[in-house]
Amino acid sequence: MGVLVKKLIDDLNLEVLVEGKEDVEISVNDINRPGLQLAGFYNYFAPERIQVIGKAEWSFLDYMQIELRKKRVKKYFSFDINCLIITRGLEPHPEFIKEAKKHNIWFVRSNLVTTQFISKTTIYLADKLAPETRLHGVLVDVSGIGILITGESGIGKSETALELIKRGHRLVTDDAVDIKDIDGQLIGRSPKITVGMLEVRGLGIIDVTTLYGLSSVVQEKEIRLVMHFEHWKDDNDYDRLGIDNEYMNILGINVKKLTVPIRPGRNIAVIIEAAAVNYRHALMSKITPVDVIENRMNELND
């Protein structure tokens, strides 16, 4: 699914010089500056990219003889271009207006410096075109680590999130987690309709922002750890040493997963806090608690 050029124009507040087709989409987040094409070189030209004319391209065209410029611009517009953008608020050469109208191609203008515009647009497209999915769960920011809590309905995910919020951590989203793969990072967000809301059985929906302040909710967070809740089963052999590596695959990316057995009396919020701190420690140190115990045992045996 691409991004409609019209939506890009609205979102980036661009000035329309020539309107194109309503249904034209952008399907790649790369950007092309057509200096080589305007010089007559079309090998490896990618017309499916957004085309951006900056000060350098504009100056090159300005020094060009009018007849040659008409010829080059006509050739350039013979390709299936989805969108052409001129930056710095520059006044376009009349040949561009004429050919854009002739071929019904979007031609718009930005007042930003070219490098700033390209950077802003690349980030925008990377977000809009990123692979995405929606999972059932709760996403919280615990000590700076994004933790996705999963498990069957009614097992206590939202109640645990509420306890974590009370302890100074932050909610990203409850019940539905929208996840995008942006440059290899899984970024989780809340659907717009439920931002800042938390559903607690027996209490109903509460507005976390109103009750606990603006700092209790964060707009998005990279998912670094998955904690899966399941009812305690006596016959299950749960990991007690932290040496079993289990992962959850989300959009083709493996995320470390911990299974937390739930039963009355266990303080799950404290366990999640410990998991977050332990995860951060593991990123900074190659020595695990198991290694420490083994070293102590070896010292005692010597």
UniProtKB/Swiss-Prot annotation:
Annotated keywords: ATP-binding, Carbohydrate metabolism, Kinase, Magnesium, Metal-binding, Multifunctional enzyme, Nucleotide-binding, Serine/threonine-protein kinase, Transferase
Cofactor (UniProt): Mg(2+)
MF (Gene Ontology): ATP binding; magnesium ion binding; phosphorelay sensor kinase activity; protein serine/threonine kinase activity; protein serine/threonine/tyrosine kinase activity
Span list, region Important for the catalytic mechanism of dephosphorylation: 261-266
InterPro entries (alphabetical): HPr(Ser)_kin/Pase (IPR003755), Hpr_kin/Pase_C (IPR011104), Hpr_kin/Pase_Hpr_N (IPR011126), P-loop_NTPase (IPR027417), Ser_kin/Pase_Hpr-like_N_sf (IPR028979)
Record: residues binding ATP: G151, E152, S153, G154, I155, G156, K157, S158
Residues of the active site: H136, K157, D175 (proton acceptor), R240
Important for the catalytic mechanism of both phosphorylation and dephosphorylation: region residues: 198-207
GO biological process: regulation of carbohydrate metabolic process
Residues the record lists as binding Mg(2+): S158, E199
Group of enzyme by EC: transferase
SUPFAM superfamilies: HprK N-terminal domain-like (SSF75138), PEP carboxykinase-like (SSF53795)
Catalytic activity of the protein: [HPr protein]-L-serine + ATP = [HPr protein]-O-phospho-L-serine + ADP + H(+); [HPr protein]-O-phospho-L-serine + phosphate + H(+) = [HPr protein]-L-serine + diphosphate
EC assignment: 2.7.11.-, 2.7.4.-
Sequence similarity: Belongs to the HPrK/P family.
Assembly notes: Homohexamer.
Misc. comment: Both phosphorylation and phosphorolysis are carried out by the same active site and suggest a common mechanism for both reactions.
Role summary: Catalyzes the ATP- as well as the pyrophosphate-dependent phosphorylation of a specific serine residue in HPr, a phosphocarrier protein of the phosphoenolpyruvate-dependent sugar phosphotransferase system (PTS). HprK/P also catalyzes the pyrophosphate-producing, inorganic phosphate-dependent dephosphorylation (phosphorolysis) of seryl-phosphorylated HPr (P-Ser-HPr).
Free-text domain note: The Walker A ATP-binding motif also binds Pi and PPi.
Protein name (Swiss-Prot/TrEMBL): HPr kinase/phosphorylase
Organism: Clostridium beijerinckii (strain ATCC 51743 / NCIMB 8052) (Clostridium acetobutylicum)
Upper taxonomic lineage: Bacteria, Bacillati, Bacillota, Clostridia, Eubacteriales
